[in-house]
Regions:
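Positively charged n-region of N-terminal signal peptides that target proteins for export
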Residues: 1-5
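Bacterial N-terminal signal peptides
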Residues: 8-16
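GH16 jelly-roll
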Residues: 23-258
Length: 258
C-alpha cells in the first residue's frame, strides 16, 4: 500500500509539472478530445482566398505600431499579395529600426469557426500569428508561432483584458516548412483549437464574448520578452510568414458586423 501511495503521488507531480510546462490553464488537451469530429474548411467558408487577389473587407496597417512587447512599426508595403499568397514580412528600417506587417478585416466577427492556411516565420524573437481582437474591452483569441521553435504553436485568449491562458501544443512538424490549416471554434462556453482539422485543445473558463476583427501579423519582441519568444536575432532578417486563405463559418445569425 505504501509503494502504491508513493506511485500515485509521483504521477500527480508529473501531471502538475506537465500542465505547468505546457501552460495548461484548466483546459482540455488532445487525448480527452477524441470524440470531437474532424473539421476542415470547405471552399464556401473561405472569406479571403489570396490566389484570387486582394479580398474585399481587409486592409494592411501602416503606422508606428504598438508598445512593448512589440519592437517594430507596421508598414503597408510589408504586406504583399502575389504568387497566390499573402506574405507578411519583417525587415530592417523605420523609426524603431524594424518594420513588421499586420493585415486585418474591416468588419467584426462573432461566434463561429475561424481558420487559416499559413506558413509560420522562423527566426528567434519573431512572432507570426492568426487571431481575433476587439480593441476595448480587449477580448482576443490567439494562434501564435514563436519563431525560436516553430515545431510548436501557442494558443491563448483574453477576456476583458485578462489573459494568462497560454497553452503550447507540440505539432510533430515544422510549421515554417509548409502550409497547414489552423483554426479555432469559438462558442459562448468554449474555444476549441484545431490543427489540420484535428481538435487539439479546448478552453472552457472565462470565455470572450465581444465580436472582433480577424487579424494576422508578424513582429519582433523587445529584449525584455526574450524568455518568451527567444532573443531576437536581426541577422535572420528579412523573415516572412505566408497565408493562402482565411476561413469563417458563423455560429449565429448576424455574426458579421461590417
Amino acid at each position: 500500500m505504501k509503494i502504491k501511495a508513493i506511485f500515485i503521488v509521483i504521477l500527480i507531480i508529473i501531471y502538475c509539472f506537465t500542465s505547468c510546462v505546457n501552460g495548461n490553464a484548466g483546459g482540455i488537451t488532445a487525448p480527452s478530445l477524441g470524440g470531437v469530429p474532424m473539421r476542415l474548411t470547405p471552399e464556401e467558408d473561405k472569406i479571403a482566398v489570396f490566389s484570387q487577389g486582394s479580398p474585399d473587407g481587409f486592409w494592411a496597417r501602416n503606422d508606428r505600431g504598438n508598445g512593448p512587447p512589440f519592437n517594430c512599426s507596421f508598414g503597408r508595403s510589408n504586406a504583399v499579395i502575389a504568387n497566390d499568397v499573402l506574405t507578411l514580412s519583417l525587415t530592417k528600417g523605420g523609426e524603431k529600426g524594424f518594420i513588421g506587417a499586420e493585415y486585418r478585416s474591416s468588419g467584426h466577427f462573432s461566434f463561429g469557426y475561424y481558420s487559416v492556411s499559413m506558413k509560420a516565420a522562423k527566426c528567434p524573437g519573431v512572432i507570426s500569428s492568426f487571431f481575433t481582437y476587439t480593441g476595448w474591452p480587449w477580448d482576443e483569441i490567439d494562434i501564435e508561432f514563436l519563431g525560436d521553435d516553430t515545431t510548436k504553436v501557442q494558443f491563448n485568449y483574453y477576456t476583458n483584458g485578462v489573459g494568462g491562458h497560454e497553452y503550447v501544443h507540440y505539432l510533430g512538424f515544422d510549421a515554417s516548412e509548409d502550409f497547414h490549416e489552423y483554426g479555432f471554434d469559438w462558442q459562448p462556453d468554449s474555444i476549441t483549437w484545431y490543427v489540420d482539422g484535428k481538435a487539439v485543445y479546448q478552453a472552457r473558463q472565462n470565455i470572450p464574448s465581444h465580436p472582433g476583427q480577424i487579424m494576422m501579423n508578424i513582429w519582433n519582441v523587445a529584449d525584455t520578452n526574450a524568455n518568451w519568444a527567444g532573443k531576437f536575432d536581426e541577422s535572420g532578417l528579412p523573415v516572412h510568414a505566408q497565408y493562402q486563405w482565411i476561413g469563417y463559418h458563423s455560429a449565429e445569425e448576424g455574426a458579421i458586423d461590417k
